[in-house]
């Protein structure tokens, strides 16, 4: 049991490090609220962050298997992002976290 907990802790640590990066949860929240494919500019506008930060976080989410990136051969280039099945599986946990944050915001106002 201890070995299993140790293995799980390593994976949890990895997830927490990734999710604690600037704007990572914001991007997941925005994409969670609107399951339709989203373009980079729409995510950037809704998250209100720099292009560099959004691009890095989307690349990290894609590398972690939480976001799909689909590029179209258009001029100018069109790229759409969607949540993967793994990210959708995280939705209940993220919803609980976001609900907790909103409830705390109501209490501290």
Give the label of every model feature segment:
Residues 73-94:
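Basic, amphipathic "hinge/linker" alpha-helix immediately C-terminal to the N-terminal HTH DNA-binding motif
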Residues 65:
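Glycine-centered, phosphate/nucleic-acid-interacting loop/turn motifs that mediate DNA/RNA or nucleotide
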Residues 1-7:
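N-terminal intrinsically disordered/low-complexity leader segments
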Residues 7-12, 29, 89-109:
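Amphipathic alpha-helical dimerization/coiled-coil segments
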Residues 10-53, 74, 80:
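N-terminal helix-turn-helix DNA-binding core of bacterial DNA-binding proteins
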Residues 69:
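Short beta-strand "wing" residues that participate in macromolecule-binding interfaces
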